[in-house]
Amino acid sequence: AMSEETVTRLRRTLAHVGKARLKDVPGLSSGRIPTLADAAALLAAMLKHLRSSGTIVSAYGLREGLLYERLSPAQRAADPLIVAARDEGRRSGRFPEHGDLLDRWIAPLFGDDRRADARLRIAACHLADVGWRANPDFRAERGMEIALHGNWVAIDARGRAMLAQALWPALGGAIDSPAPLAILAGEASLRRATQWGLAI
């Protein structure tokens, strides 16, 4: 999410940064650079006109929004992270549909999980077997890579770190957090995710 102030600051910055310098920004498509400043100005104007206090930026675009409009109410109500984790578990795991069973089994241990964290735990259960095709010495790394770099939606950096931390011990890694995770999530969050992973 970006506040109105952040969008205004982005617009001002892009108005003064040369296109040559923008080409050095990692992950920024060179095809978008010529229109980036105009897009930021348009976004700022839209926020002002709509009197919106902020915006949420989607990694997906207009096409996906049009597709979303065609979904049934039940499909729209589904949690996109859980749906994606379930699909990945079906594709990459040995035992399709085990994620829901696994979560029902361990959920009583974590009755105090906040709703936002419970959905991360459910996603971790769906991904619990994604590393089985990897060499046993690298299954934990495979799980962590999928959690951190998977094409997930409706999840932030903390959530990705918690998913990775849950899969790390579940797939044979040590209890300690691998290097990048402590930057993305706090100690209490990673400790809870470790507990999920050990239960898994």
What are these regions (language model features)?
Residues A1-I200:
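Helical "lid/coupling" subdomains associated with nucleotide-phosphate turnover
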